[in-house]
């Protein structure tokens, strides 16, 4: 399931994050430092060092915004969110086809983290650069994603995906992973659809007993499938 979440960050937050990233040249490192064997062969970008104060400061801003976003909570059912990272692609940079690693180690904690969902939060307007589309492959084919600054895309971490070469300008983004309460994508999709239906029924003044029954079904399924 691919889900677009608009306006995770407001324009002022985007400006602040962009300004900090563009003013912090010394914190940028080769993006291959965090790539696995497969990704290292096809990854050509830069990212902010994970242990830098900039990464921690800006990552906390992103996490605070996610906590206040009901669409993100409903779609991802987050158990843990990997500390947000930040990357940039200049001209001729790209990230070839790959699949994200299934398990990551959260830096400095020793905690192993299962990557159920991948997230890209765009920090550059689409007309600021050419190329740089996030291409995500699923059973329905290939999907090209290039969103407004402040918007985010969620997709299964098991997906084959790539970032196409930049031919003009610069692409800035935050990227991270979510370990969901429900690891199976099909189950999360069903719960997400049910949650949206429940919210719609509440807005339309549906019979309360029917809404309560559907809400009970949602929570019983969540109880059955939750992995904590």
Ranges and model annotations:
Residues 1-85, 190-228:
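Non-heme Fe(II)/2-oxoglutarate
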Residues 70-174, 178-187, 191-192:
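Catalytic core of non-heme Fe(II) oxygenases with the double-stranded beta-helix
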């Amino acid at each position: 399931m691919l889900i677009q979440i608009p306006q995770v960050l407001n324009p002022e937050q985007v400006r602040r994050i962009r300004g900090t990233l563009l003013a912090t040249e010394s914190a940028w490192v080769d993006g291959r430092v965090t790539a696995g064997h497969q990704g290292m062969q096809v990854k050509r970008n830069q990212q902010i060092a994970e242990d830098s104060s900039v990464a921690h400061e800006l990552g906390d801003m992103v996490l605070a915004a996610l906590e206040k976003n009901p669409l993100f909570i409903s779609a991802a059912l987050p158990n843990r969110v990997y500390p947000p990272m930040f990357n940039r692609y200049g001209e001729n940079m790209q990230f070839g086809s790959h699949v994200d690693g299934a398990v990551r180690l959260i830096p400095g904690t020793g905690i192993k983290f299962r990557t159920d969902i991948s997230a890209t939060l765009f920090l550059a307007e689409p007309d600021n650069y050419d190329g740089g589309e996030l291409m995500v492959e699923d059973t329905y084919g290939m999907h090209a994603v290039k969103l407004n600054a402040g918007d985010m895309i969620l997709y299964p971490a098991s997906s084959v995906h790539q970032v196409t070469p930049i031919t003009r300008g610069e692409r800035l983004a935050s990227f991270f992973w979510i370990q969901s309460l429900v690891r199976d994508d099909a189950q999360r999709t069903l719960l997400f659809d049910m949650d949206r239906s429940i919210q719609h029924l509440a807005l339309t003044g549906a019979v309360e007993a029917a809404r309560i029954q559907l809400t009970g079904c949602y929570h019983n399924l969540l109880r059955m499938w939750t992995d904590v």
